[in-house]
C-alpha cells in the first residue's frame, strides 16, 4: 500500500508523504507488524506542525478519501485525498512498476518536505519488500534515484535555499541497513534521512488512520485470492511437458505426462501463478517442494488454504449447484514431498511458511514425505507406471541420507525421468535443483553416471535395450499372451470399483457434463457426417490422417454409452474412500473423490507405486470398456517394484498408441503397428515460447492442433512469418470424435533486443528472430480461445480433412511426407488394424485441447502469410491462410534437441538430406542421429553397463539453475557437466541480479567446451537488466554456440483467460 501525503508549510511550498505497504498480509501476525512499521514511519517525520497539522490531515483523509481499483494490476487499490495542506495516496498491494512510478512522482514533487514509509511483508535476510509482483529493495530504490529523467529535472530546478528533504523509513535490517544517506550525484539537490528516531507523539488522527488501513489490509478470502474459473472443465495433459511459471522470488513449475501431474514449488506470490492451470485439473498427483522457503511455499500455501475453505464450505452446504461447483474447484492432492520443520516469526521466512504448510497439510489429512538420497546404487522412486505407456521415476540427488546437517533444512534436488513404453519415443529428463549448491548437485549426479539415459543428448528405450532387440518378436508374443491372460483373469474388479468411485465423484462433475450437453449443439456447426471412417483406423493414424476427423454421428452413437458407464451405480459397492485412487478413465469425466487423506505413505509409493500412485493415472477417459481389460493386466503385472516399461519391438514395429498427445494407450502394443516418433517434441529447446495446450480429461484423445509460431530470421519475418498448422503423425494422435476445440495458445516472448541482432539463417533458432509485435498481434487476436473459436466447430476454424480427403501439403512441398515414413512404416503401406477401443467422450465446451507442435525454421520459411494472428486458422480457401498443416511429424521434430529447428547443427544428428524441405519435416522415428553415438544400444547402456568416467557430462532435456544463495555459485564447470537443452533461470531476488552476469558468462564458457553441437534455450522467468546488457554484448556468440534466449513474458491463453507461463513440450 502506498500513501502519499502532500502538505504545505506555506501555501506555495507543499510537503509530501508517501507510505508504501506491499504484498498481501496473509496472517494476523504479519498485519500487526505492518501496522507497527506504518506508525513508526509516520511518527518519525519531523515536519513542523505549523507547516502541516498531520493529526488533522489524517482524520480528513479517513473521512474524505476516494478509493480506486486498478484495471491493470488486479488486486491493487489506491486510496487518495487532496486537502489544503496534505495530499494522500495509498496504494494497497501494488506491483513493482506501480511503486516505482509513485516513487518517481514523489521525487519530482516540488515539496520541500517528503516522507517515504516502506512497510509490508519482507524477507528476513535482505529486507526486500514483497509486492504483488516482484519486490522492492535498496537496489531498486537507487535505480529510481539514478534515473536520467529524475536527475535532469532535479538538476534543472533552481536550487532552493535548502534542498528538499526526503525522510525514508524502511526495514532496519538486511540491505536497507547498508543504504548510505549520501547518494552520489544528489548532493545539494536532495537530502536523504534514513530511519530517523520517532519524534511525533501518538495522536487520535493517527489511530483512526491505522484502524482504517487495518480494515483495508484484511487478507482476502481464499476464494478471492484464487478465483474460480469462468467456466468449469477438466484438462488432461498427455504428452510430456513442463509449464514454467514466473515464481517471483522463487520457482514454480508444473510437469505432466499422460495425465500424471507434478507441481514443483509454489512460488513466492500468494496469488499462485500456477492456479489458472491447476484449477482445470481434477488432481495433482505429486507436489515436490525442493526447499522450505519464502520463495517456494506461499503459492502452495494459498492452494492449501483454499482446499480447507472448500472443505468447510462443502460441509456447511448452501449455494446453488453450479455456483458451488465453480467454487469447489481445486484439484485433489496426492503425495507431498517436503523437507521442513516448524518455526515462527512475524517476518516472511521460509521456516514460517514451512510451519504453515505443515499445519495446513495436517488439517487436510496429508502427511508430507521427506526426501533424501538413499544408499548406492541409486534407486528411483516410481511416481507413475503403466504398461504400454511408460514410467515416471524420481531420483533424489540431494540431500544425502547421511547428511551431517538436519535434512529438513537442506534443499532437495530431484531428477524426474520419463521412460516411455514406445521403443522410439524419447526419454525425458528434467532437473529441479531447488537451492542445492552446484558442487553438491554435481556430486549427486556422479552417483547417477552409470545410468545410460544420461549419457546422450537424446535417448530412446530401444537405444537402451540394445542387444535385446533380437528378442522383440518373442516379447511381442509374450505381451499378447499377457493381455489375453489379463482379460481372462481379472474381469470384474473394474466394474465394481469404478462405478463406486464415479458415484462418489458425480456431484463435482454434474455441472460440467450438463453444460457440455447444452453447449455442444450450438457449437457443432459443420461436422463431417462420416461415422465409419474414424473407426476403421487406429487412433494414432486417424490423428495423423486428418486435422479434423469429425463426424458428429460417431460421437452421438458411442458417447452416451461411454459417458454413462462411470455414472451407473452398482449396488453393494461402497465408494472408495482411502483405497486406490480412481482411475483417470473416471477422473476424466469425474472429479477425484474428496478424500481427506490423499497422500499415500512413502513406503507404498516406493514399493508398489504401480498399484497405489500410478496404476490409474494414465488411463484414457474413453477406455471405459476397451481399456479396462488391459488395465487389469497391468494390475496383475505391476507388483514388482521396478518392472520394465515395455519390451522393445522390432525396428519397424513401433508400439501403437503411446501417450504422447492423447491418453490412449491402455494395453501392450502389438508389433507391426506404427508408433510415435521418438524424437523430442521438446517444444522449447528452440522454440521462442511455445504454443501449448492441455488436453481434456473428458476426452480420450484431444484434437491436437499443431498451432505454433515458427520465427524466421528478421529479414524474412515480414513476408514469410505465419502460423503453421502442420498435421501430426501418429505420435500426436488426432481425435476421431467431433470435438470442439478451444485453442490453448502460448504467446512466445523472444528476448527484446533480438531485432538489433543480424542473425544468419543457418544457426538461428526460431526463438531468436522475430519481434514481439507479431506475438502481441497473436495474443490480441486470441484473448481467449473460447471467445474466438467456439462459434464454429473445429471443422470450420481449421483446415478440414476427412479420412477420404487427400492430405494437404505445404506450398513448396507438394509431396510433404506425412510420413508414416517417419515412423518406420513405408508411406504407402496399408494402415494397421483398428484398435478395439471406443471413441473418446465428447468434450465439455470449456475444454482447451491444443497440442503445441513445432516445425523447423526451414519449413516455416516456405509458408506464406505475414501475420501471426489467429487469422491463419481460417479455412484453406482463405488467401491469407498459411499452408495447411503439413502432414508430418512436426511435433517430433520440434523437439529435436532443438538444434534441428535451427539449421540442424547437430553434427551427426541428421542426414544430409535432412536439410531439405521434406527431410526436415519427416524424420526417422529413431533417435536423432547424434554425433558420436555408437552402435545401437551404446547410447543408453543399462545401469549395469560400462561406468562413465568421473566428471563426465550428463545430458538433460530441461534443468532449472540452482536458486537462492546457490545461484551465484553456478560456474563454468556446472554448464560443462550439466548439459541441458533448456536452462531455466528463476528467482527474482537481489542476489540473483547481482550474480546474473557471472552465471550467463559461465554458460557461454561452458557451452563452448561441449563436444556436441546442441541447440540450447535459456528461459528466464523474470526481466533482468543484467541479462539485457549481457544479451546486447554477447549476442554474436549466441549464434555460433547455438544459444537462444527467450523473453520473460510468455503467456498461455486458454478459453477466455490467460496466465504468464512458458510451456515446454518434450
UniProtKB/Swiss-Prot annotation:
Location of Phosphothreonine modifications: 647
Compositionally biased intervals (Low complexity): 656-671, 880-894, 933-949
Residues covered by region (Necessary for association with actin): 967-1066
CC terms in the record's Gene Ontology section: cytosol; dendrite; microtubule; microtubule associated complex; neuronal cell body; nucleus; spindle; synapse
Region (Necessary for the mitochondrial aggregation and genome destruction): 974-998
Subcellular location: Nucleus; Cytoplasm, Cytosol; Cytoplasm, Cytoskeleton; Cytoplasm, Cytoskeleton, Spindle
Region feature Necessary for the microtubule-organizing center localization, mapped onto this chain: 1-804
Compositional bias annotation for Pro residues: 832-845
Positions of region (Necessary for interaction with RASSF1): 676-1066
Gene Ontology molecular function: actin binding; DNA binding; microtubule binding
Region (Necessary for association with microtubules): 720-973
Keywords: Apoptosis, Cytoplasm, Cytoskeleton, DNA-binding, Microtubule, Nucleus, Phosphoprotein
GO terms under biological process: apoptotic process; axonogenesis; dendrite development; microtubule cytoskeleton organization; regulation of microtubule depolymerization
Main localization, broad class: nucleus
Composition bias type Basic and acidic residues, residue spans: 466-487, 500-530
InterPro entries reported for this sequence: MAP1, MAP1B/S_N
Modified sites of kind Phosphoserine: 320, 472, 582, 649, 660, 665, 667, 737, 765, 816
Compositional bias per record (Polar residues), positions renumbered to this chain: 597-614, 766-775, 790-803
Region Disordered, residue ranges: 462-707, 758-950
Family: Belongs to the MAP1 family.
Assembly notes: Heterodimer of a heavy and a light chain. Interacts with microtubules and actin. Both MAP1S heavy and light chains interact with microtubules. MAP1S light chain interacts with actin. Interacts (via C-terminus) with GAN (via Kelch domains). Interacts with ESR1, LRPPRC, RASSF1, microtubules and VCY2. Interacts with ESR1, LRPPRC, RASSF1, microtubules and VCY2. Interacts with WDR47 (via N-terminus of light chain).
Summary of the function given for this chain in its UniProt record: Microtubule-associated protein that mediates aggregation of mitochondria resulting in cell death and genomic destruction (MAGD). Plays a role in anchoring the microtubule organizing center to the centrosomes. Binds to DNA. Plays a role in apoptosis. Involved in the formation of microtubule bundles.
UniProt remark on domains: The N-terminus of the heavy chain associates with the C-terminus of the light chain to form the heterodimer complex. Its C-terminal part of the heavy chain interacts with ESR1.
Protein name per its UniProtKB record: Microtubule-associated protein 1S
Gene: MAP1S
Amino acid at each position: 500500500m502506498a500513501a502519499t501525503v502532500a502538505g504545505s508549510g506555506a501555501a506555495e511550498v507543499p510537503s509530501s508523504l508517501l507510505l508504501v505497504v506491499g504484498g498481501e498480509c496473509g496472517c494476523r501476525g504479519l498485519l500487526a507488524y505492518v501496522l507497527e512499521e506504518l506508525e513508526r514511519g509516520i511518527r518519525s517525520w519531523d515536519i513542523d506542525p505549523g507547516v502541516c497539522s498531520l493529526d488533522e490531515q489524517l482524520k480528513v483523509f479517513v473521512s474524505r478519501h476516494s478509493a480506486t481499483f486498478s484495471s491493470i494490476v488486479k488486486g491493487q487499490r489506491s486510496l487518495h485525498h487532496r486537502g489544503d495542506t496534505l495530499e494522500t495516496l495509498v496504494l494497497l498491494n501494488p506491483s513493482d512498476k506501480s511503486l516505482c512510478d509513485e516513487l518517481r512522482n514523489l521525487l519530482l514533487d516540488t515539496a520541500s518536505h517528503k516522507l517515504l514509509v516502506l512497510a509490508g511483508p519482507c524477507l528476513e535476510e535482505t529486507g526486500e519488500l514483497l509486492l504483488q509482483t516482484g519486490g522492492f529493495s535498496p537496489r531498486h530504490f537507487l535505480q529510481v534515484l539514478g534515473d536520467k529523467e529524475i536527475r535532469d529535472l532535479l538538476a534543472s530546478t533552481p536550487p532552493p535555499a535548502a534542498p528538499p528533504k526526503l525522510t525514508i523509513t524502511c526495514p532496519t535490517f538486511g540491505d536497507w541497513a547498508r543504504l548510505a544517506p549520501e547518494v552520489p550525484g544528489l548532493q545539494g539537490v536532495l537530502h536523504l534521512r534514513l530511519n530517523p528516531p520517532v519524534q511525533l507523539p501518538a495522536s487520535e488522527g493517527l489511530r483512526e488512520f491505522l484502524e482504517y488501513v487495518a480494515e483495508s489490509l484484511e487478507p482476502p478470502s481464499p476464494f478471492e485470492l484464487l478465483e474460480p474459473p469462468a467456466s468449469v472443465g477438466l484438462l488432461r495433459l498427455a504428452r510430456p511437458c513442463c509449464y514454467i511459471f514466473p515464481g517471483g522470488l522463487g520457482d514454480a513449475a508444473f510437469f505432466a505426462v499422460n495425465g500424471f501431474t507434478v507441481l514443483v514449488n509454489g512460488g513466492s506470490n500468494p496469488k499462485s501463478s500456477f492456479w489458472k492451470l491447476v484449477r482445470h485439473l481434477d488432481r495433482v498427483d505429486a507436489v515436490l517442494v525442493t526447499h522450505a522457503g519464502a520463495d517456494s511455499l506461499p503459492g502452495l500455501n494459498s492452494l492449501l488454504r483454499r482446499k480447507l475453505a472448500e472443505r468447510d464450505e462443502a460441509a456447511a452446504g448452501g449455494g446453488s449447484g453450479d455456483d458451488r461447483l465453480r467454487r469447489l474447484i481445486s484439484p485433489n492432492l496426492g503425495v507431498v514431498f517436503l523437507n521442513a520443520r516448524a518455526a515462527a516469526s512475524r517476518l516472511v521466512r521460509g521456516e514460517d511458511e514451512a510451519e504453515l504448510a505443515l499445519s495446513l497439510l495436517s488439517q487436510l489429512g496429508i502427511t508430507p514425505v521427506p526426501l533424501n538420497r538413499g544408499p548406492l546404487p541409486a534407486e528411483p522412486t516410481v511416481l507413475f507406471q503403466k504398461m504400454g505407456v511408460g514410467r515416471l521415476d524420481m531420483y533424489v540427488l540431494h540431500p544425502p541420507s547421511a547428511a551431517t546437517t538436519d535434512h529438513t533444512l537442506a534443499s532437495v534436488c530431484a531428477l524426474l525421468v520419463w521412460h516411455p513404453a514406445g521403443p522410439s519415443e524419447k526419454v525425458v529428463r528434467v532437473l529441479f535443483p531447488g537451492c542445492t549448491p552446484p558442487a553438491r548437485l554435481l556430486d549427486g549426479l556422479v552417483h547417477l553416471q552409470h545410468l545410460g539415459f544420461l549419457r546422450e543428448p537424446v535417448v530412446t528405450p530401444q537405444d537402451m535395450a540394445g542387444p535385446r532387440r533380437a528378442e522383440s518378436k518373442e516379447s511381442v508374443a509374450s505381451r499378447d499372451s499377457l493381455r489375453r491372460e489379463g482379460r481372462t483373469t481379472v474381469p470384474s474388479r473394474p466394474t465394481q470399483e469404478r462405478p463406486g468411485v464415479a458415484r462418489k465423484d458425480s456431484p463435482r462433475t454434474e455441472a460440467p457434463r450438463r453444460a457440455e450437453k447444452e453447449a455442444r449443439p450450438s457449437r457443432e456447426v459443420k461436422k463431417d457426417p462420416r461415422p465409419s471412417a474414424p473407426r476403421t483406423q487406429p487412433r494414432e493414424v486417424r490423428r495423423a490422417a486428418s486435422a479434423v476427423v469429425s463426424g458428429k454421428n460417431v460421437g452421438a452413437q458411442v458417447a452416451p454409452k461411454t459417458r454413462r458407464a462411470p455414472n451407473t451405480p452398482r449396488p453393494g459397492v461402497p465408494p472408495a474412500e482411502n483405497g486406490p485412487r480412481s482411475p483417470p478413465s473416471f477422473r476424466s469425466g469425474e472429479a477425484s473423490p474428496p478424500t481427506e487423506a490423499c497422500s499415500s505413505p512413502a513406503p507404498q509409493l516406493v514399493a508398489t507405486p504401480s498399484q497405489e500412485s500410478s496404476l490409474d493415472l494414465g488411463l484414457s477417459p474413453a477406455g471405459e470398456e476397451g481399456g479396462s481389460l488391459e488395465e487389469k493386466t497391468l494390475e496383475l503385472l505391476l507388483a514388482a517394484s521396478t518392472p520394465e516399461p515395455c519390451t522393445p519391438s522390432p525396428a519397424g514395429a513401433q508400439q501403437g498408441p503411446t501417450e504422447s498427445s492423447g491418453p490412449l494407450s491402455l494395453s501392450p502394443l502389438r508389433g507391426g503397428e506404427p508408433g510415435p516418433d521418438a524424437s523430442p517434441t521438446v517444444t522449447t529447446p528452440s522454440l521462442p515460447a511455445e504454443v501449448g495446450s492441455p488436453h481434456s480429461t473428458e476426452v480420450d484423445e484431444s484434437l491436437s492442433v499443431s498451432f505454433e509460431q515458427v520465427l524466421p530470421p528478421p529479414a524474412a519475418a515480414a513476408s514469410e512469418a505465419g502460423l503453421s498448422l502442420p498435421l501430426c503423425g501418429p505420435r500426436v494422435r488426432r481425435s476421431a470424435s467431433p470435438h470442439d476445440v478451444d485453442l490453448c495458445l502460448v504467446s512466445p516472448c523472444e528476448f527484446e533486443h533480438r531485432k538489433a541482432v543480424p542473425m544468419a539463417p543457418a544457426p538461428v533458432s526460431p526463438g531468436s528472430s522475430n519481434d514481439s509485435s507479431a506475438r502481441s498481434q497473436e495474443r490480441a487476436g486470441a484473448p481467449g480461445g473460447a471467445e474466438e473459436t467456439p462459434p464454429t466447430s473445429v471443422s470450420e476454424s481449421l483446415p478440414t480433412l476427412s479420412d477420404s480427403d487427400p492430405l494437404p501439403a505445404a506450398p513448396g512441398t507438394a509431396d510433404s511426407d506425412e510420413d508414416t515414413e517417419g515412423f518406420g512404416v513405408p508411406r504407402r503401406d496399408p494402415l494397421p488394424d483398428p484398435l478395439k477401443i471406443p471413441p473418446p467422450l465428447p468434450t465439455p465446451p470449456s475444454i482447451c485441447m491444443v497440442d503445441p507442435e513445432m516445425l523447423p525454421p526451414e519449413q516455416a520459411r516456405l509458408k506464406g502469410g505475414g501475420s501471426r494472428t489467429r487469422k491463419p486458422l481460417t479455412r484453406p480457401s482463405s488467401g491469407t491462410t498459411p499452408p495447411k498443416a503439413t502432414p508430418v511429424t512436426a511435433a517430433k521434430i520440434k523437439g529435436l534437441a532443438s538444434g534441428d529447428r535451427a539449421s540442424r547443427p547437430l553434427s551427426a544428428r541428421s542426414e544430409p538430406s535432412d536439410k531439405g524441405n521434406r527431410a526436415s519435416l519427416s524424420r526417422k522415428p529413431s533417435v536423432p542421429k547424434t554425433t558420436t553415438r555408437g552402435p545401437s544400444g551404446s547410447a543408453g547402456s543399462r545401469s549395469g553397463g560400462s561406468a562413465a568416467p568421473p566428471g563426465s557430462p550428463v545430458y538433460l532435456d530441461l534443468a532449472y539453475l540452482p536458486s537462492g544463495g546457490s545461484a551465484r555459485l553456478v560456474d563454468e564447470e556446472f554448464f560443462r557437466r550439466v548439459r541441458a537443452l533448456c536452462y531455466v533461470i528463476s528467482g527474482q531476488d537481489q542476489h540473483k541480479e547481482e550474480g546474473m552476469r557471472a552465471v550467463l558468462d559461465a554458460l557461454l564458457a561452458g557451452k563452448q567446451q561441449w563436444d556436441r553441437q546442441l541447440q540450447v534455450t535459456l528461459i528466464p522467468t523474470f526481466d533482468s537488466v543484467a541479462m539485457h546488457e549481457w544479451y546486447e554484448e554477447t549476442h554474436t556468440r549466441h549464434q555460433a554456440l547455438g544459444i537462444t534466449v527467450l523473453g520473460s513474458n510468455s503467456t498461455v491463453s486458454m478459453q477466455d483467460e490467460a496466465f504468464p507461463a512458458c510451456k515446454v513440450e518434450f
